[in-house]
Amino acid sequence: MEVLESKPLSAISMVIDAIGVEHDSQNKCYCCNEQIFDRFICRMDNRSYHENCVKCAICESPLAEKCFWKNGTIYCSQHYYKDYSAHRCAGCKKGVSPTDMVYKLKAGLVFHVECHCCTLCGRHLSPGEQILVDDTMMTVSCMSHYPLPMDDPCPPVGPSDVPSCSSDASAVAPYPMDESFPFQIKKEVDAYGYNFEHYSFSDFCDDDSRMLKRRGPRTTIRQNQLDVLNEMFSNTPKPSKHARAKLALETGLSMRVIQVWFQNRRSKERRLKHLCNYLRHYEQRGLIPPPIHFRNEEMDGTDFNSFCGNFEEEDDED
């Protein structure tokens, strides 16, 4: 009888011991290597922590609500993005946090607002200001550091930025751009967190420039077909696929030709709008805008019919 009573007690003791060993191994703090007896336990990547041990490894600030874990190390938001952000500031070379206010240039460079300064004189560069961008060194500088002659009011534009818009190449780049001076004139295209107007010389170039796109088969549209397309564009600048199919049946043109025609027409409208903003930008400051040359055709500011008859097919889809 006594033997029978001792066996269940022995089994229960073994179970309790086993549970105790497992409990100790799971509730051991990974940071301080001490046993956790707190009511609440923090767990990350199958590792347990005291609440007080969850702090940034750099600034040691306590992280009660949110933390970042990388290679076994805990970081706060500021230091995590500073070291491991996918986007780096071209000025200070530090990471960019999602809450940081930054400038994004057309060359793909990103700057903190406080880091957007001239690399030569240290002057802070304002949004919309013409600047010199060195894609190789990832730096920006003022226009005053560009070697311009005194009798030329219009700064030359690098050939890699703006395609030749005139039959005379010297009208666009009258001064050679050799490898010893790799700067290129660019405009700020976007400013995160701000709503600035932007202007780009490349927006005013003609579609016929070979540097903008490859040459494709040309299609000539008859006047009656053009009238139908213009009427549709005045009502719906971006028709649906079903509407383009109806136009194809009505005009006899292929859907691809109709699609490209609407793409080019919308592009002309946008270019004209940018041109008006570009001229207004100078007029508001009492300045005379530099001349803009277009190759093979003179652009009419109010009538598009003169250059909508012939166009090149593009590869872009709606």
From Swiss-Prot:
Keywords linked to the UniProt accession: Developmental protein, DNA-binding, Homeobox, LIM domain, Metal-binding, Nucleus, Repeat, Zinc
Gene3D superfamilies cross-referenced by the UniProt entry: Cysteine Rich Protein, Homeodomain-like
A GO molecular-function descriptor: DNA-binding transcription factor activity, RNA polymerase II-specific
InterPro entries: HD, Homeobox_CS, Homeodomain-like_sf, LIM_Homeobox_TF, Znf_LIM
The keyword Metal-binding belongs to this UniProt entry's keyword annotation: yes
The keyword Magnesium appears for this protein: no
One Gene Ontology biological process: neuron differentiation
Protein location: Nucleus
Example of a GO cellular component annotation carried by this entry: nucleus
LIM zinc-binding domain span: 27-86, 87-152
DNA-binding region: 214-273
Function statement: Specifies differentiation of the set of six touch receptor neurons. Binds cooperatively as a heterodimer with unc-86 to sites in the mec-3 gene promoter.
Name by which UniProt lists this protein: Mechanosensory protein 3
Gene name per UniProt: mec-3
